[in-house]
Amino acid sequence: MIRLSLYIYRNPILHFVSSPISTSLSLLTLSLQFEVQMSFAKKEYEFLKEIGLGPHNLGCYASGVWRGNGPVITSINPSNNQVWLICLSDCKISFLKFEFDCCKFAIAEVTEASTEDYEEGMKACFEAAKTWMQIPAPKRGEIVRQIGDALRAKLQQLGRLVSLEMGKILAEGIGEVQEIIDMCDFAVGLSRQLNGSIIPSERPNHMMLEMWNPLGIVGVITAFNFPCAVLGWNACLALVCGDCVVWKGAPTTPLITIAMTKIVAGVLEKNNLPGAIFTSFCGGAEIGQAIAKDTRIPLVSFTGSSKVGLMVQKTVNERFGKCLLELSGNNAIIVMDDADIQLAARSVLFAAVGTAGQRCTTCRRLLLHESIYQRVLDQLLEVYKQVKIGDPLLSGTLLGPLHTRAARENFEKGIEIIKSQALAVSKNGGKILTGGSAIESEGNFVQPTIVEISPNADVVKEELFAPVLYVMKFQTLKEAIEINNSVPQGLSSSMFTHKPEVIFKWIG
């Protein structure tokens, strides 16, 4: 039960016109104020308190202070897409109080950063950089070590949050947080190896010294699919190198951004260091554009789509800044005629279905030698039947939801394109062998899909960010390599074979 207070206003926020109320209070204008400041609406969200989250959160950490003067957004669980919705059945009146059942609730609310918040944060970060770069690298490494330990202490809770808010299964959520911990360990070692060079000089009795100096501030813009691991890949190295970090997380995973920042902020505070060394913003394109344009940020790391990445690169280049870009992928697995078929089938399953096909390195194209084509395909179809789809927090689930309703709609559009090509009786048309439908539910669930298709089909050359696997034949290794390289995205590829000469030919 949720208790709501009843107030009387001239300009109401919300009117109730159900007959029991309007009959007895027909002369009054009613307004309700929802009181949920003290606890989460659902018990399964209560663990979020252990990592510093509440029903309402400020989404900007600037100058070592939490603030937020931008729009208020809602963090939604992709397994059920629940938003604030009150069930008015069995409504009871009790002396200016209402009690009724609430049937659907989002996870929490977040107040995003405004452009004013951004500017305040950047001013403080710019000043903090002067302090941080003067601290010896091994001591910076010690701070990163403490961050890693703080993450270890909250590994389970953070991993659970990743699964809850992003939608990947719990094992993947915990594994993602572990990646940051591992990067902290790596960066600690690196902090004692930032060596320069001694270079012989042409002048007698002279030598030249080369040493590394911090850039100052590194901007990190991360995507929803790996909402905290990508931060670790960038921030751990930036911090030990003496750079401050400005982080903008994905707008659809704000709670992860806040929880991670609270961990880092706690370590900085414990060591009496400026909180502005690590500045973070929850926000949308406006904040991302500000980072890309900001001349105080010499290096911007962006992870996301090729379309947006191109825009970021152009903006940063126009001010002669530097970019690190990790963009779209269209990854292939090549299975040669001598491969271990069972091993290949199991590996392809998780490569194509894991994270609901929303990894940058998801297997999207499966290239099978014609002599084993049907055998591998039969095994793959069999293991696809065993995929458990559902709540990513439940044991045994292998395929969670797509991250947003828009992603589910994009999956459906992609399937329609595949079907239309097949209906056109095109030599490049696709045939759906299994899956191919969204699952009727409140969540963003879709069926894992296998499509038999020509490598020349236009749809194969696009990145459909969903669990859709395109299967195609090849006759020779040369042909397989040509197919592998025939898409504009690339990013990663894999091979199954027992022959070293084939491996070396494949890797060039």
Predicted regions and their residues:
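ALDH superfamily catalytic-core signature
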Residues: 266, 307-455, 473, 477-478, ...
